[in-house]
């Protein structure tokens, strides 16, 4: 089974989209549609419905690894694998999916520490113009090293980041004082600042201080940029554990 899951669409404090895969070695024959939408581990952990604008696709994968490697996807412009799907014995059932969630939503502002806990080096005071340039939209002529001239353009990034929405995706470059387009900046008590490591821990749904093991702040930020939003594997694990309990009782 696989789902492409945006953590924020299930109430978590970060907009982070990743593929989550669950597999069994010796599973009984599945009802593919039921497995995808109802009985599957991921369907129970993260409910979905099919996006009605697109059809559900069925196709088969060649069982011979050599043939599959050389022939799969030839002539296909868009991947046959969609947002969610199941596969068993080479048979694939997949679709574009819409999340089903009606619970509470956590946002960036929920994870901020008090301003008194923020070290002075996290406040932005001297190089504000650099931050404004990098965060802003732009369309400008640039010249490559080989002399080729081109127009570089990009849209603006929220500056500061909205506190009433889940954070953007945390990247490995979140640490360090230098201005950056991708780092988060929040406004607190009228002052702009970067996120501290304890906040990054919590945006990945680790306990506050999880990475406070003696590492530098930059290394802590790097670790969180490489992490998953842990609420997702936790919910998948809860379903797996419940199934294991049922199997043992039988």
Go through each PLM region and give its residues:
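C-terminal target-recognition/interaction regions appended to catalytic cores
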Residues: 89-250
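Class I S-adenosyl-L-methionine
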Residues: 1-162
